[in-house]
């Protein structure tokens, strides 16, 4: 593309050139590029004039007279044919575009998103406009031939035509229209500066990009791909996997919130007689198909599949009638209809799926249980060990669940009962469809022996083939005859032990409260079709906005961002079997870490674009893009906002004691009452050593600053009380709004507070006599107070509650102190925070006694600890970190337990210790504490 710096008249395209006397053919000065391109364009117009002269008079017309037209990219009719049409009808054909205002019309079949934004205010038409104008012999409205539609953000007006169109062939009207359009272009030329040229060179594109270029020329295809600005919204609204993952995360959070508040503290079980656990594995039968046909008795008896209905769409779910014909989930609709021509394909009904799933989990939550594990929207595991004593009790609960689900949703579920997760899962297979089945340790060998090894969890096709090649093993019964040593030697210590255990029905997986989510991701692997590199950049930006939107809903920040690219595999076809699908691909992954947690678009975008360019995949070969936020933490900005709101309430209701007291309004009293209930930790502190009220002179008190007078008066009133008033219960509406870690901490501290008497802090040496009354040392206390007042003329005492301040993260403490104009020295001299609460374990708190207790526990449980004991001890160590703030004590306990098992190498204990360490390290990570060094 060329830019001419000289002002010159726009060529009109008619034969008005005198080639012999034209200065365009004279020599060009050295390095005078502007003059060179000016002469070059003049020569091209001479060629157009020569072409115009060579055309028969009968084929000429002045239809495009006064219009300058350029062509961009591939067109149909071709570039040469369109040029001849324009020139023969009196138009000026522009081969090199100086700027947007140098032409009247741009003819093209396709524009990239960035070029479309550049030319959105210009007349960009399809090639058909040229052809139809010549056919009808008049200039047609260009708006009907736009290459791209107007932006959805721009409001448009609709007008009803009030006059009939003029008859064809009215030359006067045509010329008037042309002159008006020319006049408009001249106006635009004065308003806009010359823009950068854009004509795309398709010769540099790869074969895959050219294929996508041809594919995207179809507007229906283009609107179904990432080229559509609304693609993400449409994609996620109709994506089955997106709905499943979103609902699963929501159900996990909701169930965790409901169970955490009511979960009892589990003591170490001293009664070892009850060794067996009872688990229920509950699952819908053909969930999507059952929900879609639950109100149609006719469809229930016919083969039905749920899919989008397109031939190359995958079946999400099919009922048992369809499975009789060999149809399976994941099969293409076309293949399924070949097996069963009478197959009925129904579309997705995501609203019904969510409604039924919520009814399902409501029933499970209302069932007596210890824990619930959300597997998917239609499948869950329940631990009901504490609620039953035999398998017969489990059968009754399972049948109750089935009947309630049938009544509420008109769908069927199957239930598997077992002493561990593995056996409950295998029992569920036996129970399907529409039944209940139990599997105990006593009959495990009879049930497992005939099954294939691939029926075991964690055994894939490659491991099964390896077992067959080395040991001739096909069934679980054959696997049971292989020694543990041989399996560990072949597959490694851990996986070999896993194979040995699960073949005998031994499973150490446990069900407990769900851990907080560690990542948030956005993935798209359908409809991804790019032509140019900037297409991928544009879509990547939209994808990042979607990721940040999801992070905002979860109120989290990220420490690490990961980019995933799916590239068309070498030799794979450009068009996969699934319409606009990914097909056979190769995956590329790259991550980048931030020094501090962030949700800044600019910071993350800089990392993402750098990673995208580093991977360097041809844009035409990209078949999928994903972004994942890793190492996410809660955003403390909401906590800061809540704290400021409480602080503002305190400042509004502070009472000044200048001669007269001020009554607090009833509305303010209500606010203060609510504040006491919402913040049980906000206990007033006593920052001064005060004598009794009778020994304080009112004249001396008047010499102090007003803010200090108010604090002293308030403290004197509080000295009359022996016990601080404390709310007996927490507001459940407030607790639900808190993040899970903070809610747990508030519950723990509230329980501690209700089990002991809270007394006011004092910075003097307090002594309590037999009657329980405090004696405050009064020597020189008030003199010291006056000395403090003289050193600082005015102490602006901020409205900060230091017990609350102590519980906040360090960075948030600094921010609040800065905003309150409180120096670090003032905090040290005026306030002493209370000592951390010492947490006991089995009435023991010293490290020496704890070591003895752990040694006794390890020696008695030689076959491995009880899982409830493990959870209880892990929770205790977390409380040491959370309440005592004693990382050294927590570290020494974990090291001692690790050393106890180091010599014995007891595998059950090894797994239990790993579980404890994982829980404790998670607590550290949640509190932004570096991991403890155990090994």
Curated annotation (Swiss-Prot):
Keyword terms: Cytoplasm, Cytoskeleton, DNA damage, DNA repair, DNA synthesis, DNA-binding, Magnesium, Metal-binding, Mitochondrion, Nucleotidyltransferase, Nucleus, Transferase
Biased composition (Polar residues): 162-178
Residues engaged in binding Mg(2+) 2: 283-284
Site annotation Interaction with target DNA: residues: 578, 589, 591
Cellular location(s): Nucleus, Nucleolus; Mitochondrion; Cytoplasm, Cytoskeleton, Spindle
GO biological process terms on file: error-free translesion synthesis; error-prone translesion synthesis; mitochondrial DNA repair
Region (Disordered): 162-193
All residue ranges annotated as the UmuC domain in the record: 279-460
Cofactor dependency: Mg(2+)
Any one GO molecular function term: deoxycytidyl transferase activity
Gene Ontology, cellular component aspect: mitochondrial chromosome; mitotic spindle; nucleolus; nucleus; site of double-strand break
Protein's UniProt keywords contain tRNA-binding: no
Cofactor note text: Binds 2 magnesium ions.
This protein's name: DNA repair protein rev1
Organism: Schizosaccharomyces pombe (strain 972 / ATCC 24843)
